[in-house]
């Protein structure tokens, strides 16, 4: 008995240590505050906690780990294991996914946005480019078409866009520039102050961001149907951290992505359903842009910017035409499925 007890004690300690080494906590860098845009990350954390009995958890930090424009850099050096970023913040670092920010692609809903994003994320060119930053594309943060809020008289004609100072990034910024506007790429967290101080006249956001970042509180009007495009914001993971996961934890992570996205889309749908009441509550006029104006905007922005993007990508050795064709074919399939 005297010789057995120490052995049992050693085995117990070894077992405890083995169990402890299985525990995994990932730091996740996002920004702003919890909102529709980050609900899939929170849902992913809940699912991982449930599936692993608390052995794999996410520590989600809003701005405490990095600035939003530096999240991809943080991933590259292993400062944290997971992060969200928007392609327009550093288009030169994530050229492939900027195909999803081209104006007037024709995406009509969040399900279609998920489909085209997944197709591009799975393309070898996207995988290879993100690997340069030690990043693996995990899932998108699908957003509806962007629309403007502004002060003063509504901008309802193409001539009204000339000289308009607008917060718009990526392909959207280029679209407004083609119409004579002056785009600025201040971050989402800076947009309210830029609008309040008069640095910009208008801000292009999806609905959740107008609400979360307060630009709707500055607005006199909102365009209901301009729909020039959207911004693509991936969630990525550090490759080293991903590959170091146990098989069980990696399976739990990969197997939770679709459910997290489904939750995100359903939650965002609830926001869209009550958007008209939000406008009424805040006294914001809903502006419908005429079809002629939208067609004129599309003629100035869509084809020229698309052609320039494809040529630029091909010149850099990236399959620009192939990526654009992938988006259009995937979108056609998604629309046919509905």
Where are these regions (language model features)?
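Absolute protein N-terminus
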Residues: 1, 23-24
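Bacterial N-terminal signal peptides that target proteins for export
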Residues: 1-9
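Hydrophobic alpha-helical targeting segments used for export or membrane insertion
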Residues: 9-13, 17
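Sec/Tat signal peptide C-region and signal peptidase I cleavage site
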Residues: 17-23
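N-terminal secretory/targeting leader peptides
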Residues: 24-113, 121, 126-338
């Amino acid at each position: 008995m005297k010789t057995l007890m120490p052995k049992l004690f050693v085995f117990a300690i070894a077992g405890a240590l083995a169990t402890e080494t299985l525990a995994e906590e990932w730091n996740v860098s996002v920004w702003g505050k919890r909102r529709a845009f980050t609900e899939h990350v929170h849902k992913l954390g809940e699912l991982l906690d449930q599936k692993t009995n608390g052995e794999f958890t996410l520590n989600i930090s809003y701005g405490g780990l990095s600035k939003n424009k530096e999240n991809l850099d943080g991933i590259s050096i292993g400062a944290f294991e997971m992060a969200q970023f928007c392609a327009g913040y550093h288009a030169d670092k994530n050229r492939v996914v900027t195909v999803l920010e081209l104006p007037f692609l024709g995406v009509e809903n969040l399900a279609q946005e998920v489909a085209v994003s997944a197709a591009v994320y799975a393309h070898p060119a996207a995988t290879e480019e993100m690997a340069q930053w030690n990043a693996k594309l995990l899932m998108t943060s699908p957003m509806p078409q962007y629309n403007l809020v502004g002060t003063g008289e509504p901008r309802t004609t193409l001539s009204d866009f000339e000289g308009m100072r607008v917060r718009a990034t990526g392909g959207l910024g280029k679209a407004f520039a083609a119409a004579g506007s002056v785009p600025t790429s201040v971050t989402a967290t800076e947009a309210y102050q830029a609008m309040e101080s008069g640095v910009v006249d208008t801000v292009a956001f999806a609905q959740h961001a107008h609400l979360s970042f307060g630009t709707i509180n500055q607005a006199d009007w909102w365009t209901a149907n301009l729909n020039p495009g959207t911004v693509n914001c991936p969630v990525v993971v550090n490759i080293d951290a991903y590959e170091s996961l146990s098989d069980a934890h990696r399976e739990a992570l990969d197997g939770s992505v679709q459910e997290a996205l489904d939750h995100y889309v359903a939650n965002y749908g609830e926001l869209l359903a009550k958007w008209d009441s939000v406008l009424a509550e805040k006294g914001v006029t809903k502006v419908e842009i005429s079809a002629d104006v939208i067609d004129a905007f599309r003629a100035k922005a869509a084809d020229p910017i698309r052609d320039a993007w494809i040529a630029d990508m091909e010149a850099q050795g990236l399959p620009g035409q192939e990526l654009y064709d992938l988006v259009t074919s995937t979108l056609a399939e998604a629309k046919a499925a509905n």
